[in-house]
């Protein structure tokens, strides 16, 4: 009973004018250009909320999708479904994504974050300026056919230029282009390992060893070939160059 009385008194105090005056206000201030500048509390809330969209941004708006798909196809081509493990591939993909996206991140930092942290521009202007380098990166990797497809599905009419492409069309078109590019790279990776599989299977058939799994015999030859050509360096270097070629 005492606890209930205490909670009731505490609730009444919180809703009193004196307590409300001590709480920080969530206000916005008008700017000279006609916009609004939100208080630090609102900006912090928006920033923390935006962090929940970070995985989606990583998958949909960076080079991560192409890299992780190529790594998965490489593992299938080698015939090692559990080596390297998923954690290692994810770590490599994240680091390679960071290196590839570093010019875009630097431009966002210089053009958007620094002026916003110095209170030279509003949050809306910072968001607009920060989105421009990311849009330019995505447009460079997106095929015109994919843009036309999603523009037709959205009934938006013919696109007038790169600046007129809305994000709701650019995002799925970019992901579709990344999937196609990743599968093209994966096809190129599969060819030498497929030749090894065919040769090993033919040799085993000629020797009458039909009960021996060809994948077991072919695996060391695949690993030896991949190591001899310095496959990891070749693959990661080619992936990085594919975004700026």
From Swiss-Prot:
Subcellular location as annotated: Cell inner membrane; Bacterial flagellum basal body
GO annotations of cellular component type: bacterial-type flagellum basal body; plasma membrane
A GO biological process held by the record: bacterial-type flagellum-dependent swarming motility
UniProt cross-references to Pfam families, sorted A to Z: FliP
Mode of membrane association: Multi-pass membrane protein
Residue spans crossing the bilayer: 45-65, 88-108, 185-205, 209-229
Origin superkingdom: Bacteria
InterPro entries: FliP, T3SS_IM_P
Additional observations: For insertion of FliP into the membrane, cleavage of the signal peptide is important kinetically but not absolutely required.
Protein role: Plays a role in the flagellum-specific transport system.
Name of the featured protein: Flagellar biosynthetic protein FliP
């Amino acid at each position: 009973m005492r606890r209930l009385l205490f909670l009731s008194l505490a609730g009444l105090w919180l809703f009193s004018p004196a307590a409300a005056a001590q709480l920080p206000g969530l206000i916005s201030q008008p700017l000279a250009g006609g916009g609004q500048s939100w208080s630090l509390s609102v900006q912090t809330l928006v920033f923390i909320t935006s962090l929940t969209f970070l995985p989606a941004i990583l998958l949909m708006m960076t080079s991560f999708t192409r890299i992780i798909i190529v790594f998965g196809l490489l593992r299938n081509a080698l015939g090692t479904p559990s080596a390297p493990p998923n954690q290692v591939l994810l770590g490599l993909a994240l680091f390679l994504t960071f290196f590839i996206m570093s010019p875009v991140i630097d431009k966002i930092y210089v053009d958007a974050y620094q002026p916003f942290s110095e209170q030279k521009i509003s949050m809306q202007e910072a968001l607009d300026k920060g989105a421009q380098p990311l849009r330019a990166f995505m447009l460079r990797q997106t095929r015109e056919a994919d843009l036309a497809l999603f523009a037709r599905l959205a009934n938006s009419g013919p696109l007038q230029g790169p600046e007129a492409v809305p994000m709701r069309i650019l995002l799925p078109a970019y992901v579709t282009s990344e999937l196609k590019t990743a599968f093209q790279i994966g096809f190129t990776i599969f060819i030498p390992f497929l030749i090894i599989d065919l040769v090993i299977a033919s040799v085993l058939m000629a020797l009458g060893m039909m009960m021996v799994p060809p994948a077991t015999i072919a695996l060391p030859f695949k690993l030896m070939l991949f190591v001899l050509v310095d496959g990891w360096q070749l693959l990661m270097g080619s992936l990085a160059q594919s975004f700026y070629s």
